[in-house]
Amino acid sequence: MFTQNHFEIFSIDGLEARMAEIRSEIQPVFSEIGQKLLTKLSAKISNQEFYFHIAQHRRRTANAPENTWSAISTKARGYKMEAHFQLGIWEDYVFIYLSMIDQPKKQKEYAELLTNLSVEKMLTEDFIISKDHTKAEVFPLSAFSEAAERLGKVKKSELEIGRLWSKERFDGKEDSKILAEMLETIDQLLPIYQKLMEV
């Protein structure tokens, strides 16, 4: 599980230095938790193969990443072309999202489906959304409908929906509780994910 030390990695100066710590310290935690999420998904959707990915930030040549993430998708060679699950970390929180980023192939179809779903009624109030995977800013679930409409109208728009856990909770005392909440987050998002996979 994540610890306070993992959040401090985002204070390290320099691309190479920060990436070295991300690889050695954060990515093993992604793998540990990610395998549990993968097992949960495979059990719930037994007729589908799922693959675990870790963001490598290979395109970066100067600026160190302000966040990093892992992903679960049905594609062996990538994840951004379809709706997928993400487990990631910023300097002040950890998140799990159902993500549609970087112009997935069925972006318009996803948007049409989501604008007609009563997503706010399908999820508990502690769910939040992100409109840009490169920014830490999040919005309440009440902003979902507007963001879903934008996903269909603006080519470069993005939509992520899920939960976050503030860094203060990662003191080692709540690890099992946080993991249970993460697995339950996948459970709540699954009905939406399954509908997206059908379009």
Swiss-Prot record:
Q: Where is the signal peptide?
A: none
User: Which InterPro entries does the entry mention?
Assistant: UPF0637, UPF0637_domain_sf
Report the SUPFAM superfamilies cross-referenced here.
Answer: YktB/PF0168-like (SSF142913)
Q: Where are the transmembrane segments?
A: none
Q: Pfam families under this entry?
A: DUF1054 (PF06335)
Gene3D superfamilies this protein is in? Protein of unknown function DUF1054 (3.30.930.20)
Q: What family is this protein classified in? A: Belongs to the UPF0637 family.
Could you identify this protein by its name? UPF0637 protein LACR_1918
Q: Which source organism?
A: Lactococcus lactis subsp. cremoris (strain SK11)
